[in-house]
Each structure stands twice: as structure tokens, then as C-alpha cells.
């Protein structure tokens, strides 16, 4: 094993000198043994001349000193894979952080792997039911597809991701991998305890590199989670779910690493390699003929600006987008999904059927008409509208409220039992509202209920 010596430490950047001709390859993992016997992992990023490499640390560099010995592992960071990682919480280098002892996995994958070849990819389009009305009706997720949850600060991205994990794990009993990338540690802790209570934890692997970690860990933790998911897809032929919260932090950490390595920044201070890094990650999240990886990625939108380079780069890779809107959250409608801004590639009658497609288009049409009429209502009031338009507004407001739904993971906050709504019940409910079958019911009856039958029951109590 080649050994080198630390020559310079600048925060998370560590320069290491090796004897001439023994430089580690780019992306190879190096290990430093601290005085207390624990190991710190560095990842090789640049070759500076004949004998020096510049590395990024995966943990804080406190306690490191110049002259310390560094060992070259001769391969990239390895993630433990297989059934042994289910029910466990790991960090970026695959070490357990749940206090349950070592992970006895028989196999490990490098976190840097090439994407599957074109001829191995699967191209079939199939809808994936989530039990959340607004998603299933208007922007259906595809099995083996990529979905982005876009939203500014505090509009409910993490709650929505947690609800999806809950619904899918309970209803579809598939394996899930959750990668917590640069988000709040409290949220990771809540997720861990909720999963243990609901029993979902046995089918989930969690990988965390949260806000308090150095940028190297945050820039790599998504890849660790992805390698675990790839094992289940390629070697066990499973349909896996990969949740990443938050993909923006992956880009943000990449920008920090890029600046630390002295690269010239590009637009808005992001790294010049933004598109490449995102592409390398997203190109691995695909479905092959062996199995599928269905991914749901929360994407923070800085200052609610969807044209910012980070969310804009992520947009190009997605099959469906769920855009969370502050205006809708302000109305108290949760999940605060913008039904007119959200899209899906499989919202196509050939894939989802005419009944679903026609209902979705009718819902979008009535909401768009209501949006167009809002200026007139704001200036002249409701009385100036024609009878036909008054009817449109009344039905649109009912549709808008019926798009809300009580969540299982938010029961403690709302005091309402969570609801999983099957697709046929969702379609039936919206068809009836648009056809005018429930014109006599107050709009409040449709707020935070599951099926249309529940709305009718609620109306009797109002």
C-alpha cells in the first residue's frame, strides 16, 4: 500500500505528498489514522505536479497535522451493499451512525460507477400510484422515472417526501433508499423515529450527510445512496425507490468544493462543471431490463426563482415535476402543489387511459379559467361575473380544496387521520365535482378529506 504525508491543510482541503511515481488516481480514497485510532477518509481531486495531490476530506479535519501518514486504498470510496444495509443508517463512507455496531455486508460497491449502457435500459412507461390525489391525477409519476419536488423554503418538500416513503413502503412493500443530502439533522432524526414506529425501517436504507458535514461529504452522499440502490436493481433485479432530499444541496456542496479547489466560478457563483456533475448523478438513476430505480428528488429553489442554474439544470433530467407553491400554501391547501405548473411526461391517453387523461385536463381547464377570472373578481367583485362564470368559480374552488389531503406523517400537527386515495376514487371524485353533481355542497366540505364520499359525509356535519 502506497503511503504519503500530509503537507498542507486548509479547512476541508488536504494536500498530500507521495513518492514520485506513486500518485493515487483521481477519485481514489485515502485514509488517515487519527491519534484516537479513528480513520478519516480523503478523496483525491487534483494532481499538483509530480508528487503532490489535493484531496477533499469527508469529515472535519480537526486534529490533523502536517507530516501525518496517509495510506492510499487504491480504489474509490466503497459503500456497503446488500440486504444487510436495510434498517441501518450510514454516513458517506458507509460507516454506521445508528449506534448498532458494524454493518456485516458481504459486498461493497464503489460510489463512482459508470451509467448502464444504452442497450441495457428499459423504455416502458407505466404509472406508479402514490395515493396522493393531486399527484396521481395531474402529474402521475412513472415507474422507474425521475420526479422532482420543487419548492422554496418551508412549503412542504420534506413532508411530501416523507409521506411518499410512508405510502409506498406500506402499500407496495418495495425497498427504499433515502439519501439525506445537506438538510436539517432534526428532519433526519424525525424520519428515523417515524420509520421505526411505522415498521417501514426494515425495508429502507438511510444514508446521511447533513448540513453540519463538510462539503466533501455533502457532495458525495447522494452517490453512496445511489450505489446501494444500484445493487438492489442490478444484482437482485428489484424495483427500488430512491429518495434524495435535497438535490440542490448536492449542487451547493459541489460549488463549495469547486471554489476550495480554486476553479473559476460560473453563473451565479456555481461550479463550471455543474451540468456534468448533475448528469453523472442523474444518468445512473435509470431503469434497466433487470430492475428499476424510481427516484423522487426534493429540489430547493433559491429565492423561489426557478431560473436559478441549480434547479434549471435538474429540470432537464426529470420525467415529472411537482412544483410546490407559496401562494397555495398561504391558502392553507396542503400538499401545496401548483396544479397548473406541475408536469408529467406520462400524462398521455396512450399510457394512462382516456378517462384519467380527460379528467386531468378538465381539472386543469377549470382551474386555469378560475385563475383568468381572478383579476376581474379582484377589481369588480363576484357580482359582475356571468352566471356561467360564477358556476366555474364555485366548482374550481371546490376542486382546489379537494386537491388537499390529510397526510399520515402530519397527523400530529393536523389532528386528522392520514388518507391513501386510490386512483379510481380520485378520478371519480373530480369527475363528479366538474359534472356539477356536488354543486349544492359547501366548499369547506371538500377541504382535507380523502375520497368524495368523505366530503359528502363531512357536508352533513357542517
Curated annotation (Swiss-Prot):
Keywords: ATP synthesis, ATP-binding, Cell inner membrane, Cell membrane, CF(1), Hydrogen ion transport, Ion transport, Membrane, Nucleotide-binding, Translocase, Transport. One of its GO terms (cellular component) is proton-transporting ATP synthase complex. Its EC number is 7.1.2.2. Its main location: membrane. ATP binds at residues 151-158. It is found in: Cell inner membrane. GO terms for molecular function: ATP binding; ATP hydrolysis activity; proton-transporting ATP synthase activity, rotational mechanism. It comes from the Bacteria. Produces ATP from ADP in the presence of a proton gradient across the membrane. The catalytic sites are hosted primarily by the beta subunits. F-type ATPases have 2 components, CF(1) - the catalytic core - and CF(0) - the membrane proton channel. CF(1) has five subunits: alpha(3), beta(3), gamma(1), delta(1), epsilon(1). CF(0) has three main subunits: a(1), b(2) and c(9-12). The alpha and beta chains form an alternating ring which encloses part of the gamma chain. CF(1) is attached to CF(0) by a central stalk formed by the gamma and epsilon chains, while a peripheral stalk is formed by the delta and b chains. This is ATP synthase subunit beta. The lineage of its organism: Bacteria, Pseudomonadati, Chlorobiota, Chlorobiia, Chlorobiales.
Amino acid at each position: 500500500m502506497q503511503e504519503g504525508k500530509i503537507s498542507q491543510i486548509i479547512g476541508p482541503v488536504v494536500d498530500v505528498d507521495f513518492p514520485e511515481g506513486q500518485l493515487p488516481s483521481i477519485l481514489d480514497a485515502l485514509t488517515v489514522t487519527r491519534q484516537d485510532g479513528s480513520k478519516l477518509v480523503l478523496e483525491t481531486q487534483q494532481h499538483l505536479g509530480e508528487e503532490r495531490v489535493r484531496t477533499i476530506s469527508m469529515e472535519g479535519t480537526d486534529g490533523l497535522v502536517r507530516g501525518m501518514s496517509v495510506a492510499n486504498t487504491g480504489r474509490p470510496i466503497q459503500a456497503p451493499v446488500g440486504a444487510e444495509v436495510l434498517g441501518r443508517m450510514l454516513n458517506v463512507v458507509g460507516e454506521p451512525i445508528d449506534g448498532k455496531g458494524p454493518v456485516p455486508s458481504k459486498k461493497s460497491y464503489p460510489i463512482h460507477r459508470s451509467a448502464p449502457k444504452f442497450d441495457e435500459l428499459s423504455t416502458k412507461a407505466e404509472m406508479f400510484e402514490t395515493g396522493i390525489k393531486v399527484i396521481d391525477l395531474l402529474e402521475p409519476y412513472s415507474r422507474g422515472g425521475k420526479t422532482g419536488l420543487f419548492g422554496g423554503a418551508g412549503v412542504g418538500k420534506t413532508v411530501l417526501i416523507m409521506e411518499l416513503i410512508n405510502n409506498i413502503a406500506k402499500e407496495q412493500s418495495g425497498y427504499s433508499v433515502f439519501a439525506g443530502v445537506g438538510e436539517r439533522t432534526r428532519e433526519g432524526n424525525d424520519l428515523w423515529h417515524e420509520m421505526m414506529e411505522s415498521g417501514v425501517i426494515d425495508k429502507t436504507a438511510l444514508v446521511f450527510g447533513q448540513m453540519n458535514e463538510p462539503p466533501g461529504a455533502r457532495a458525495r452522499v447522494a452517490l453512496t445512496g445511489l450505489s446501494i440502490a444500484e445493487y438492489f436493481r442490478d444484482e437482485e433485479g428489484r424495483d427500488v425507490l430512491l429518495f434524495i432530499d435535497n438535490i440542490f444541496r448536492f449542487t451547493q456542496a459541489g460549488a463549495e468544493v469547486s471554489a476550495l479547489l480554486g476553479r473559476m466560478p460560473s453563473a451565479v457563483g456555481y461550479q463550471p462543471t455543474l451540468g456534468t456533475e448533475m448528469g453523472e448523478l442523474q444518468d445512473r438513476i435509470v431503469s434497466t431490463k433487470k430492475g428499476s430505480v424510481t427516484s423522487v428528488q426534493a429540489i430547493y429553489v433559491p429565492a423561489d426563482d426557478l431560473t436559478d442554474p441549480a434547479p434549471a439544470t435538474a429540470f432537464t433530467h426529470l420525467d415529472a415535476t411537482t412544483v410546490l407553491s407559496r401562494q397555495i400554501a398561504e391558502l392553507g391547501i396542503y400538499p401545496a402543489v401548483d396544479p397548473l405548473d406541475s408536469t408529467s411526461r406520462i400524462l398521455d391517453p396512450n399510457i394512462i387511459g382516456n378517462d384519467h387523461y380527460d379528467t386531468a385536463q378538465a381539472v386543469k381547464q377549470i382551474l386555469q379559467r378560475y385563475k383568468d377570472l381572478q383579476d376581474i373578481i379582484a377589481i369588480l367583485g363576484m357580482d359582475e361575473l356571468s352566471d356561467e362564470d360564477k358556476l366555474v368559480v364555485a366548482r374550481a374552488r371546490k376542486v382546489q380544496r379537494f386537491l388537499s389531503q390529510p397526510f399520515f406523517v402530519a397527523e400530529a400537527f393536523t389532528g386528522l387521520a392520514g388518507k391513501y386515495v386510490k386512483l379510481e376514487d380520485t378520478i371519480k371524485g373530480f369527475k363528479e365535482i366538474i359534472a356539477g353533481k356536488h354543486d349544492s355542497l359547501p366548499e369547506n366540505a371538500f377541504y382535507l378529506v380523502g375520497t368524495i364520499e368523505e366530503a359528502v359525509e363531512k357536508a352533513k356535519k357542517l
